Design a protein with these regions (language model features):
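Short, surface-exposed loop or secondary-structure junction motifs
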Residues: 79, 133-335, 339-340
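Short, glycine/proline-biased beta-turn/loop segments that scaffold the active-site neighborhood
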Residues: 117-133, 222
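Short, gly/Ser/Thr-rich active-site loops of penicillin-recognizing serine hydrolases
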Residues: 355-420, 487-505
Length: 505
């Protein structure tokens, strides 16, 4: 009896072993069928075509899925003059993708209870403060700086790295241009100065330079060994920047006045680690620096950017219907650099694309979409069936109350400037500065605010060149017009303007 029992047990054990082995093999085959090795040949072909036909010096790309790097490759030259090839550790200028890194640093300080996102930015600024001619500056909070609703407006200014006075402190920029133009929390206005101020907040709160804080609290813990703040003439493996002209000429080395907005350099390999953090994967060679709760908060604290399905979180642009998926994007672009980090968190996928020259957004998006299509069959299906529809341009009639003559002052850091604006239904629209010649208004539009351009000169040193286009963005409050005049000269500099309607014709 015992013999038969033992024999039965042996056979039972063998059958179970065979069954488990077969099931394991079937499962493995199933996974291979479901997740074949991605074919990135079309993605690479698109990149090579750009290098060949559009004279792009170099492009580097990385694709991450489920915490693994599926593609990481560089094409072309980091430095044409010295015939230096780009590689996955070459550091590229990130332009406004830097904002995602600055926002991450703010969230780290928030987790350490050194910053309250709902507190005024001025609470944390030591030497200079933002100001306003109309609004309560305490409403310009850290979170509103992060999502571009603080009331600040357009600002951009660089200096040449080899100039003795470069770089300059952001303090002068805040003192001269840190003006709350719009009611905080009520208007999305993309602001480089806002992120420059956040970089200053990080420095003032941590008692470290902004550069040192990023190095010690973000780059080193994440293992981002080829990431740093600001251009360096001594750094060896850095992609030279080339203008987007037909010759792709070498661009000068410049430094931003707002490093928190646009001064980080990084490589595709480093940004792959940064993406893994936000996809909540194990960071290769690094450790987690902010919690998943902070990541969710950054990606879900949304304000509308004015386009369908387009929002802005804290340091990230959000598209809630990107070919059927929610996409989280950090992006920077200038005439001499391009940087993209686009994630689809629900699928645990990210694509990074870097270049050392200006490339159109459509070209970059096509490459990124092809990469997503290689790893996400549903994305590929949605992309192929997508039919672009032209959104009709909505026109707004100018209110009759805007017609007439307006007089007031432009406030600059040097002096106040008299200004008169004349608007008529017949199209005789002019701006007069001081008692100078009338300047013809062009591109007059109305969409909640009044927009138009003139060519002139405010005679302030910061513009450096003249004449230049001045862009007006004005709001009406009863018989008052207020808002921003942006001097688009060598820099983009905003000035406060306030006018009252007169009875004059």
């Amino acid at each position: 009896m015992k013999f038969f029992t033992a024999r039965n047990l042996v056979w039972k054990h063998l059958l179970i072993t065979v069954f488990i082995s077969a099931a394991t093999e079937m499962s493995a085959q199933s996974k291979l069928t479901e997740n074949p090795k991605p074919d990135f040949s079309k993605t690479k072909k698109l990149i090579k075509a750009q290098l060949e036909h559009n004279k792009i010096p170099s492009i580097s790309i990385a694709v991450i899925k489920h915490g693994k790097i599926l593609l990481e490759e560089s094409f072309g030259l980091a430095d044409k003059e010295h015939n230096i090839k780009a590689n996955i550790h070459t550091s590229y200028y990130l332009a406004s993708l830097s904002k995602s890194i600055t926002a991450t640093a703010i969230m780290r300080l928030s987790e350490e209870n050194l910053i309250n996102l709902n507190s005024p930015a001025n609470k944390y600024l030591k030497n200079v403060k933002v100001s306003s001619f109309l609004w309560n500056v305490d409403s310009a909070t850290i979170q509103r700086l992060l999502n571009h609703t603080s009331g600040l407006t357009t600002y951009h200014r660089d200096c040449y790295l080899n100039e003795p006075s470069c770089p300059q402190s952001i303090d002068s920029a805040v003192q001269r241009y840190g003006i709350i133009f719009w009611e905080p929390g009520n208007h999305f206005d993309y602001s480089n100065l806002g992120y420059g101020i956040l970089g200053k907040v990080i420095s003032d709160v941590s008692n470290k330079s902004f550069s040192n804080y990023l190095e010690s609290e973000l780059f080193t813990p994440l293992g981002m060994q080829n990431s740093f703040l600001g251009a360096s003439l001594n750094y060896k493996n850095i992609a030279a920047r080339y203008n987007s002209d037909s010759a792709r000429s070498r661009a000068p080395d410049v430094v931003s006045y707002t490093p928190g907005a646009s001064s980080v350099y990084s490589s595709v390999d480093d940004l792959a680690k940064f993406a893994m953090l936000f996809l909540k994967d194990q960071v290769n060679g690094g450790k987690k620096i902010i919690s998943n709760n902070s990541i969710d908060y950054m990606e879900n604290s949304l304000v509308s950017s004015g386009e369908a399905n387009r929002f802005h979180g804290l340091g990230w642009s959000i598209n809630t219907n990107y070919y059927g998926f929610k996409a989280v994007t950090g992006q920077g672009g200038t005439s001499d650099a391009n940087a993209w980090l686009r994630m689809i968190p629900s699928e645990d996928v990210a694509v990074i694309l870097l270049s050392n020259t200006g490339i159109s957004g459509d070209i970059c998006t096509n490459i990124i979409n092809e990469a997503f299509s290689s790893v996400l069959p549903k994305f590929k299906q949605n992309l192929s069936s997508y039919q672009k529809t032209d959104t009709p341009v909505q026109s707004f009639l100018i209110s009759d109350t805007l017609y007439g003559r307006w007089k007031g002052k432009i406030h600059t850091y040097k002096k106040d400037i008299d200004i008169t604006i004349s608007l008529s239904k017949e199209g005789n629209n002019f701006v007069t500065l001081e008692n100078d010649n009338a300047l013809k208004i062009s591109n007059l539009e109305f969409n909640e605010r009044l927009f138009f351009d003139v060519f002139g000169d405010l005679k302030v040193d910061d513009t450096e060149t003249a004449p230049y286009k001045m862009g007006f963005e004005l709001s009406q409050l009863d018989n008052k017009l207020y808002g921003a005049i942006t001097a688009n000269a060598k820099a983009q500099l905003p000035f406060w303007v306030e006018l009252n309607k007169t009875a004059e014709r």
